[in-house]
Amino acid sequence: MTHRFSFGLLAGLLLICAVLAGCGSQQTSAPKAERVVTDTAGREVHLPEEVKSIAVVPIPWASVAFAVDGSADRIAGMHPSAKASYEKSMLKVLAPGMANAATDFVGQDFSIHMEELGKLNPSAIIVWNYQEDEIAQLEKLKVPTIALKYGTLEDVQQGIRVIGQVFGKEERAEELVRFQQDIMAYFETKKAELEGKAKPKVLYLRDRDLKVAAGGTVNTMMIETAGGVNVAKDVQGQWTPVTMEQIAAWDPDVIILSNFDPIQPADLFEDKLEGQNWKNIKAVREGRVYKAPIGLYRWDAPCVETPLMIKWIAQKLHPDVFGDYRLTDDLRGFYEKFFSYTLTDADLKMILHE
């Protein structure tokens, strides 16, 4: 009896000591290291010292995150449309593991499914800057939330820098920004040569509903920088539906087809789109209908490769002015410098739809 009591007392004392030791260690342990990053909405975001994974709500930013980090290993989740773009892009070649990134934490409308996000348990999440309700909810859940503004090339550059801070890749981020800035500086040197030249009328078209890139889109900047004029520059909004009659009145010299839908130049050349008459449009008659390229992401939207997109448009509009570079060489240089990857001829054909 005495031995049994002594053993029980000893076990109890050991348990109490263990609990007290645990409490003491909790009280004296140093707080987890944090970093503070300011997003493009001006919010201070507290991040863990090491960001092990991120979830990305806005469609284009997953490709930007890959470019900044040089890897997709930390991209735990992305938008379903970003995954659809991935399947047709160079990311599938450069980052096959990105195919495993989750998409069920975010809806097509960018609504965030908090339960699914919780399963991912990311170190941080990237959202659109206008998602104020979601940001408030994520803050309550203590999920570090980075809000990024989007719409212009400058927005992309600011976002690149923020993501560089998130990943601890500030120097690489600056190299990407300089890459963009150097190409844009090249276009500044071409303004004098474009003076007095006729500006081709360009229609930027998206899907069978005849949505066009209106004056509020980055596509207007792309076209104008390349020496053209967006026929829809006075149309309000972003991607705005118009009528076939309006397109006939514009009678564009060049048509660029978006990568957000499957329509191909042949669909216009062969008049395959029901209820639409393309055969009398100048761009169709003269064979100047082109499918926009897709590299890391669809070049239609602001992205890491936007300056290359402008170079592509420029050679379609003014090959005499912009004959001092080979876009294929520029592409090869970009992929070799940032991803240590040599583009094959097949890769180039895929990117440029040739």
Task: Give the location of each predicted region.
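Bacterial N-terminal signal peptides that target proteins for export
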Residues: M1-A11
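Short helix-initiation/N-cap motifs at beta->coil->alpha
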Residues: T40-G42, A101-M114, V235-M244
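Extracytoplasmic substrate-binding proteins
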Residues: E34, E44, E134-K211, A232-D234, ...
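C-terminal motif of bacterial Sec signal peptides marking the signal peptidase cleavage site
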Residues: A18-G22
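Alpha-helical, coiled-coil/dimerization segments enriched in small aliphatic residues
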Residues: A213-W239
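Bacterial signal peptide processing site
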Residues: G24-Q27
